[in-house]
């Protein structure tokens, strides 16, 4: 097939179905943009989770008799417990926090509690950094019930709750993207049907003179995939605009405090090939199936 003929057929299809083509481009842009937003949230959650996991610590709270009578972990019970923790293969580092230090640390983090919280409210504890914070349950189970242990707290459970919100946001974006994708598929199918109908005479003549089915249907496939490519381009541009105008300003303080990972232009460029593949494959497959069902001769 000559490229000039193919280009002319594609441009003719666009001219005859301008409004439907624009609607398909915009619907594809919205669905692909939402899907890309969901992918960015997933990347944000994974990168931020890595930041927090590096900071995660298990805290082994000690009983009242140890907290009240041992400020430097010199007693036999405290030393034995510390040695038991340090000799574990899954432990990376251990530090002792006495009652006064625990109180000072709490007031530093939450100064509003200074007038209502007494020093006796905070037990002494061991702050333990694990080799793999993801596998904290084995450590927690081993520590509970040990002599001198009051309770065990792991920060990873709190982090999991935090990132459950991000997971919910990404799932919501994917769900809306799916609905929009269905709309885009219906528009593509409708556009291909209308384009084939408006050119039915030309197609019939071409078939009579021996043109293959593939020869007559390729312009419709290219038309749909080209429109989808435009939609993906708009979606990627939209993600960059959102990143520049919204995320950069709204999350700047969190970035500076290293509370969450930064969404960069490189992240958007990383997912762009996948978005392009998704958009072109969705449009091409839909157009092909529509032509197979609609144009049977």
From Swiss-Prot:
Record-level GO BP terms: cell division
Record organism: Mycobacterium tuberculosis (strain ATCC 25618 / H37Rv)
InterPro entries: ABC3_permease_C (IPR003838), FtsX (IPR004513), FtsX_actino (IPR047929), FtsX_ECD (IPR040690)
GO CC entries: peptidoglycan-based cell wall; plasma membrane
NCBIfam families for this protein: FtsX_actino
Topology versus the membrane: Multi-pass membrane protein
Its biological purpose: Part of the ABC transporter FtsEX involved in cellular division.
Extracellular face of the membrane: 43-171, 241-267
Family: Belongs to the ABC-4 integral membrane protein family. FtsX subfamily.
Key words, A-Z: Cell cycle, Cell division, Cell membrane, Membrane, Transmembrane, Transmembrane helix
Description of how the protein assembles with itself and partners: Forms a membrane-associated complex with FtsE.
Principal cellular location given in the protein's record: membrane
Compartments (UniProt record): Cell membrane
The encoding gene: ftsX
Pfam families reported in the protein's UniProt record: FtsX, FtsX_ECD
Topology Cytoplasmic: residue spans: 1-21, 193-219, 289-297
TM segment ranges: 22-42, 172-192, 220-240, 268-288
Protein name, per record: Cell division protein FtsX
